[in-house]
């Protein structure tokens, strides 16, 4: 790795500042999903085992910067962490002037977004945060695409900055899939809009042998192939781009299996009746909400040949059971595959949970925006600063 990892650093008797991603759902003062907290435990436990003191920082939600708002407080998260790790977790509401913590102890700082200068990563705030510790550990891949005070600025001014266990695992999995994949490689890019995934599609074209599109993205490609998509969600102004991608794929020998059949409905509703049709038979008052059985078979067959699979986004409105068959078939094809598989993005994780294939996916990324930017080939500021620090 081109940056220091947690295991490269002496942590004994050090105050260790850890940027975690504890942006979790909280209802009535209780954390309702502990997945992101559990993901940070290996890093926290390792620091404690090495004789360090742990100071945790995270954001929660989108409060107005500089204003305290109890609904965005991390106090319930500190309680949830204490239950999971079976140790006391002190909570520091006002922490910028210093944190009282000894080796073997854990302190959870209040929401970093209550601090003026967090989003702009001001030097003043970054230096203040850096002065609280001896070592900075970046372990929040989900925020690595943001140059903020608690993810980027602090790393500039603290003596030692490194990657935590979760961040290291995320990058290793993504680099294995993108930079040194075992071929053939398949990527699934689903979701509602081509516009948000256009650069992802273009960046993946010269890396994959199979590129599967789904959801509203697939509808734009169906339109690009000259078929009517009726009342479906698609982007008219990006049909030309989709046509270009199809032409580029053909020239590169990349297989983009645009759906040949679909499940349509007259209305966007959970109770809408699903009608299976060839794409050429979709009429004006119908909307495409899922791929059809023939398309499912084609995708499943293609995925059998893959040795690496990258998955971002569903292929239909899987939240509605009548239109979940395509994403279910895709999930099962990935689960049954021998390939190294990496999945990421909120909807993708929800699909993995719905269809119970968590243990059959090689690596599930906790990130959304950062995952997409990595797929686009963009540099992530919070990772770049770790690389710079390793050279100094």
Curated annotation (Swiss-Prot):
Keywords assigned: ATP-binding, Cytoplasm, Glycolysis, Kinase, Nucleotide-binding, Transferase
One term of GO molecular function: ADP binding
EC number: 2.7.2.3
Pathway connected to this protein: Carbohydrate degradation; glycolysis; pyruvate from D-glyceraldehyde 3-phosphate: step 2/5
Binding-site list for ATP: 197, 319, 345-348
Reaction(s) catalysed by this chain's protein: (2R)-3-phosphoglycerate + ATP = (2R)-3-phospho-glyceroyl phosphate + ADP
Primary location recorded for the protein, binned into one broad class: cytoplasm
UniProt record similarity statement: Belongs to the phosphoglycerate kinase family.
Protein name, UniProt field: Phosphoglycerate kinase
